[in-house]
Amino acid sequence: NCKSGGYHQHYGKENIIKNNIFANQIRTQLEASRIEQHLSFNFTNNIVYYNSGSLCGINWKNVGHKSDYNCYYCTNASEKIDFQGLSFSEWQHKGQDTHSFIEDPIFTDIQAENFTPKNKELLKKIGFRMFDYSKAGVYGSKKWKQKAELSNEMKAAFDKLVKEYEEQNITDW
């Protein structure tokens, strides 16, 4: 649940984006802001689920990537799943997501943010491996986990920046 870009590629080469659940970003689910002259990432075995906005944001169809064995699903019947103007079929004809599906993963309880998929057949088709998403993130010793924590000053600075952008009604940052 973020404003946009549940996955956002900025810099990087041959990143691996695998076995994730991206759910309910407000504006766009996937985006890339920097086009580089190499394979930026592989996007496989992911579930992208949303109820508002669009599937793809800026540059998704132009960034160098390979995408396959994913599930895309939009609960809003008025929204058409497309890849920046390309239908799913056209996207596949370009060599992307040839083994992917538009299908409901049937999450356990969306309202309670329990994103455990119940559609086991779909999980097999896309090679998705179940995991306890509540344990995702930095793990290890207490000292190691503390390295990932933001200081109160950093949190306050971030909150201030967001507020300033919202007051200026800046939508693309």
Regions found by a protein language model. Give the residues of each.
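Extracellular beta-strand/beta-solenoid scaffold signature
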Residues: 1-9, 26-34, 52-58
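Alpha-helical context
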Residues: 23-24, 46
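Active-site neighborhood of glycoside hydrolase catalytic domains
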Residues: 1-7, 11-22, 38
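Acidic, glycine- and Ser/Thr-rich low-complexity intrinsically disordered tracts
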Residues: 13-18, 36-173
